[in-house]
């Protein structure tokens, strides 16, 4: 495969938003390295599926290495994998803490560090793009959804998005974040949909396509970096 074809790494890619992103990046002409803890092989020669726990410090470097080995480069990274545990703060356990920080922070760190290093080896002034997935709960906390660990970890991603955007702006790597509201995915039981829809001023849950389109917009928006793009049906604006 030509080393001039752009290459994206997408985590949490086996279902939901991640699976939608794999299809979207292929439509943009990218080869894709798709990771999830459990993921089946793809019949598409432009998609390399790699099973692995993103919380394992060895998984991120392995994904970047395989992207370069199979496709020759890395141009985009979508840190889609994430864990959300809603509990009262005093009920969180050490296991909860390790799980959430392992995926949301440790997984982000080791993969993004290696991915940016690979992007910097690309020629030209537009070398790469990182997109993180956050949550609108950081900006609009709700008594109905106690989420201190999400705020701790995803809030950190919002902050590091701005930090990395400035650090690498002059070197051709952009860094942005999408902060979704509640999205209609298999993780939400159908009987909860009405209640979840009521938490958004627009009166509905988000769809997978809403997030995929936001991310592909950022992928092509060359003047956007350091952006926290809320795709939350108005949640972050208020009620």
What residues fall within each predicted segment?
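Short, small/polar-rich loop/turn modules that mediate ligand/substrate recognition or access, typified
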Residues: 169, 174, 225-226
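Conserved glycine-rich cofactor-binding loop
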Residues: 14-15
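A short, exposed helix-loop element centered on a Lys and neighboring polar residues
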Residues: 112-113, 162
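Catalytic loop of short-chain dehydrogenase/reductase
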Residues: 124-156, 161-170
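C-terminal substrate-recognition "lid" of short-chain dehydrogenase/reductases
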Residues: 207-231, 236
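Substrate-binding pocket helix/loop in short-chain dehydrogenase/reductase
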Residues: 88-89, 96-99, 196
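Conserved NAD(P)H cofactor-binding loop of Rossmann-fold oxidoreductase domains
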Residues: 80-85, 233-234
């Amino acid at each position: 495969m030509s080393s001039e074809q752009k290459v994206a790494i997408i985590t949490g890619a086996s279902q939901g938003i991640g699976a939608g992103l794999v299809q979207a990046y292929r439509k943009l002409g990218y080869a894709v390295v798709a990771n999830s803890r459990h993921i089946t092989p793809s019949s598409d020669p432009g998609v390399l599926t790699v099973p692995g726990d993103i919380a394992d410090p060895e998984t991120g470097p392995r994904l970047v290495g395989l992207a370069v080995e199979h496709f020759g480069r890395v141009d985009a990274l979508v840190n889609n994998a994430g864990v959300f545990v809603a509990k009262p703060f005093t009920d969180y356990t050490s296991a909860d803490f390790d799980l959430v920080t392992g995926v949301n922070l440790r997984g982000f760190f080791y993969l993004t560090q290696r991915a940016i290093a690979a992007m910097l080896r690309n020629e030209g002034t537009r070398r790469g793009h990182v997109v993180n997935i956050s949550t609108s709960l950081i900006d609009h906390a709700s008594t109905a959804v106690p989420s201190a660990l999400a705020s701790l970890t995803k809030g950190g991603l919002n902050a590091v998005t701005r930090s990395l955007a400035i650090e690498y702006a002059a070197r051709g790597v952009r860094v942005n974040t999408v902060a979704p509201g509640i999205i209609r995915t298999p993780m939400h039981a159908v009987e909860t949909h009405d209640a979840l829809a009521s938490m958004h001023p627009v009166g509905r849950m988000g769809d997978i396509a809403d997030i995929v389109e936001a991310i592909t917009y950022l992928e092509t928006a060359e003047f956007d970096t350091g952006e926290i793009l809320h795709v939350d049906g108005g949640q972050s604006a208020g009620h």
